[in-house]
Amino acid sequence: MDRIIEKLDHGWWVVSHEQKLWLPKGELPYGEAANFDLVGQRALQIGEWQGEPVWLIQQQRRYDMGSVRQVIDLDVGLFQLAGRGVQLAEFYRSHKYCGYCGHEMYPSKTEWAMLCSHCRERYYPQIAPCIIVAIRRDDSILLAQHTRHRNGVHTVLAGFVEVGETLEQAVAREVMEESGIKVKHLRYVTSQPWPFPQSLMTAFMAEYDSGDIVIDPKELLEANWYRYDDLPLLPPPGTVARRLIEDTVAMCRAEYE
């Protein structure tokens, strides 16, 4: 699936190492390989964006290595491809040896997988399913400031799905653990790959059922009900959290205006 990059190869370049992304001038590189000193590197095409190939190169650059969060304002499709590249690079880096027998592994030529040369075990990139849910109570939405977001951003509740748990059960558990309330009328909305580090966000909307807000201080700094026309600082556009909030606001406007 991979090949050596030549001088006239062009497209978008995802150069990644240890979950970092090469961002010269703070941007995802685009153009001919020769312009970025990438000729001769081994690359894997991981998709296309607006008719141009998107290449993954597993390489550590001395300067300008940053987080994929820095390109979150890109078009959603290109951001997802950048996230795919970072996740694949880390997968290949962390699966050089078989977890069963310890022998060296090699990449599959037909799919994104690593194969053991000894016991023939096959490994795929790990994906961690998560839930994220917007909770509405009359004309208000529950928004929280997470301990990991100390920049004033308020967002909806989210968490990882546990082993042996349905998505619906995960929503009920996470909401109760983080905020102390119960929800009802759960409705699936959409999903979004989220490379922090390898999540798949499954988005829901729900209605408040019962209980008072009691936050988990290990997870949240605060949580409150906010009227739809008086909201705090929100996640950036393009995130599934922002979509859930905007969808909830639209529902409130339709009912209360």
Swiss-Prot record:
Query: Where does the record place the Nudix hydrolase domain?
Result: 125-248
Q: Which domain of life is it from?
A: Bacteria
| Gene Ontology molecular function, alphabetical | magnesium ion binding; manganese ion binding; NAD+ diphosphatase activity; NADH pyrophosphatase activity; RNA NAD-cap (NMN-forming) hydrolase activity; zinc ion binding
- State the UniProt keywords alphabetically: Hydrolase, Magnesium, Manganese, Metal-binding, NAD, Zinc
Q: Does the keyword NAD apply?
A: yes
Q: Where does a divalent metal cation 1 bind?
A: A158, E178, E219
Identify the residue span(s) of motif Nudix box.
159-180
Per UniProt, where does a divalent metal cation 2 bind?
E174
The residues that hold substrate are: K25, R69, E111, Y124, Q192, P193, W194, P195, F196, P197, Q198, S199, A241
Offer one example of a GO biological process linked to this entry.
NADH metabolic process
Binding site residues for a divalent metal cation 3: E174, E178, E219
Q: Which reaction does it catalyse?
A: a 5'-end NAD(+)-phospho-ribonucleoside in mRNA + H2O = a 5'-end phospho-adenosine-phospho-ribonucleoside in mRNA + beta-nicotinamide D-ribonucleotide + 2 H(+); NAD(+) + H2O = beta-nicotinamide D-ribonucleotide + AMP + 2 H(+); NADH + H2O = reduced beta-nicotinamide D-ribonucleotide + AMP + 2 H(+)
Entry's Gene Ontology cellular component terms: cytosol
One Pfam family hit? NUDIX
Q: How is the cofactor bound?
A: Divalent metal cations. Mg(2+) or Mn(2+).
Database matches in SUPFAM superfamilies: Nudix (SSF55811)
The answer on whether this UniProt entry bears the keyword Kinase reads no
Which InterPro entries does the protein's record reference? Answer: NAD-cap_RNA_hydrolase_NudC, NudC-like_C, NUDIX_hydrolase-like_dom_sf, NUDIX_hydrolase_CS, NUDIX_hydrolase_dom, RNA_Hydrolase_NudC, Znr_NADH_PPase
Q: What is its EC number?
A: 3.6.1.-, 3.6.1.22
Family stated for the protein in its record: Belongs to the Nudix hydrolase family. NudC subfamily.
Subunit-level organization: Homodimer.
Functional description taken from the UniProt entry: mRNA decapping enzyme that specifically removes the nicotinamide adenine dinucleotide (NAD) cap from a subset of mRNAs by hydrolyzing the diphosphate linkage to produce nicotinamide mononucleotide (NMN) and 5' monophosphate mRNA. The NAD-cap is present at the 5'-end of some mRNAs and stabilizes RNA against 5'-processing. Has preference for mRNAs with a 5'-end purine. Catalyzes the hydrolysis of a broad range of dinucleotide pyrophosphates.
Q: What is the protein name given in its UniProt record?
A: NAD-capped RNA hydrolase NudC
Gene designation: nudC
